[in-house]
Structure formats: C-alpha cells, structure tokens
Amino acid sequence: MGCTLSAEERAALERSKAIEKNLKEDGISAAKDVKLLLLGAGESGKSTIVKQMKIIHEDGFSGEDVKQYKPVVYSNTIQSLAAIVRAMDTLGIEYGDKERKADAKMVCDVVSRMEDTEPFSPELLSAMMRLWGDSGIQECFNRSREYQLNDSAKYYLDSLDRIGAADYQPTEQDILRTRVKTTGIVETHFTFKNLHFRLFDVGGQRSERKKWIHCFEDVTAIIFCVALSGYDQVLHEDETTNRMHESLMLFDSICNNKFFIDTSIILFLNKKDLFGEKIKKSPLTICFPEYTGSNTYEDAAAYIQAQFESKNRSPNKEIYCHMTCATDTNNIQVVFDAVTDIIIANNLRGCGLY
C-alpha cells in the first residue's frame, strides 16, 4: 500500500503553518520540554517509531549503529526461517521436496548452537535459499497466524542473496525492520519545532508493563501503538489471548487511568501495510465475531478505530487517531508533524492563547 499524502495529512500541514505563524506572532519562543510516552502491547511497532525519530530528527544511523545491527539482521533472518521449519512439524505440512529436510536440520543446528548472529556460510546460505523456495515452506509461511513469526520474515528471506553477500551492510530499511524485544525503558531526546522532546519507549510484553509506572508523572502526551495486523494473532506470552483484544484492554486501562486525566492520547493504528494485505485473506470476524461490514481495508480499519475510541469514558478527552506504517519514514514524518501540532495547540490552550 502506498503511503501518499491524504487530505487529512495535507490539512495537517496547513494547520502546522498556521500554528507556527501564531507562535511567532505571540513571541512564544522559549523552548518547552515535552514528555512523550510510547505505550502499546508487544510488537506493536513502538521501537520502530523510536528508530524513525533517530532518522528524522537526529542524524540517522552511524557506522557504529550499522555494525551493531548487522548480527541482529542475521539472527532475525535465520530465526524466522527456523520458526517456519518448526511449524512445518506442528502443522503437519510436508516439504515440496523431501531433500529439504537436510537443509532444515542445518538451519536448526545453527540456531541451537547459538550461531544465529554470525554471517551465513555459503553452504548455509544455499540451504536457506532452497528452503525459502520450497512449496511446503511457502504454504507454512502463509499460515503464520497459527504460530509466532516475526513480521519482517518475508522482507528478510526475500533478500537472502543480498543479506548473505560477503560485503553485506544493513540498509536503513533493514535496520528499521529489525526486531529486538524491548526490556525496561529506552529514552530518546530530540528537538523539533522549538520543543525539547523526551520520548520514552516502554517494553510492551506483560512482564515489562510494571516498569511503566515510573514514567507517569507530568507526561505531555501518550502515543499508543496498536498493530492493526494483530487481529488474527495471539500473544507471544499467552497463546490464548488475541493480540487485538489485549491491545483494547490495555488501551482502556491507559485511556481511563486517573494519572492521565489531562494527558493527550494519540492512537497510532500501525502496520497498515500488513493489515491491507491480510484483510484480503483473513476476515475481521476472527477477532470481532459481531462485525458485519466488508473485509476491505477502509471498512475494517474504521471498525477497529471505532472499537478503540469507544473505550474512552471521558466526555472531554479527545483521542487523536492516525493510521501508520512505522517502517515508512515519509508517513511517520507527516504523522509526527501533525502530532507535534496537537501538542503545541494543547499547550497554547493551556495558557489561554489558542
């Protein structure tokens, strides 16, 4: 799905210009501290948003960053393939060519020896490419909602020849798509539109959530991330709970929390690209049995948005919602620009100036 400028985004740019003009006229030039909390269930795209801030508002990834992400790309790639191989057994799927079993064993052996962060040997690379090309593996990949698989599996496995090259260096997109579970709290600082941002990315898995409480004081706004594509998947940490239901429950508790009575809440309905692909094959009724609309991107996404908005029990609290694709830098740049304008407008309203 392309991420071109929508009417809503063009309006946001116009609003942005107007607010900047107001600020200049009012002579409010003292830089203000903004504390942003990134919340959401595990694997909703929070850390990818942080990486985008590094690209958009800092200097992107340094040579040192690229070096550090290289083993992560190797690991994400081979671990994804190993997860598909393991699911072949669980789901009882046969390989298109039974000789692939030897290739599968080689992949699983590398993972069990914990050599997954190392460059692929020529033999291993050939085995991985043969496996990814196998019809049984592809059938198993198409059923990935039935087991746990990294969202970037296809992206990396489609690029095996490039990632397996001797002179491989991760690209910006490779780095954006890496998946490392966030433990604890990661703080990022940057300045934009005369505001000093302190952005806190908090681990989304259930075990990490108790660490959020320290961040609750004087938060300017919360960005709550939801993986739209999680509607037909279960949690890593609890395979009986649907990911979208978990997100809704968590959003309810954040949105109506006494700590956040006066905090702006910005909802990022993320992974809209994956959702757009998935909704063609996997009906929304998997998650919402009462849904009677069509399985088009527009209708299904609007229904999910309404489910989240209905959790807000405060009549004077507004939820600002954006459909996002966290791996698309242009999309996040436009959306974050609009988010900043909301923060500025709310700040001015607080001072009676807007």
Curated annotation (Swiss-Prot):
Residues 266-273 are annotated as: G4 motif. It is a lipid-anchor. A lipid is attached at G2 (N-myristoyl glycine). GO terms for molecular function: corticotropin-releasing hormone receptor 1 binding; G protein-coupled serotonin receptor binding; G-protein beta/gamma-subunit complex binding; GTP binding; GTPase activity; metal ion binding; mu-type opioid receptor binding. The GTPase activity is promoted by GTPAse activators, such as RGS14, RGS16 and RGS19. Signal peptide: none annotated. This is Guanine nucleotide-binding protein G(o) subunit alpha. It comes from Bos taurus (Bovine).
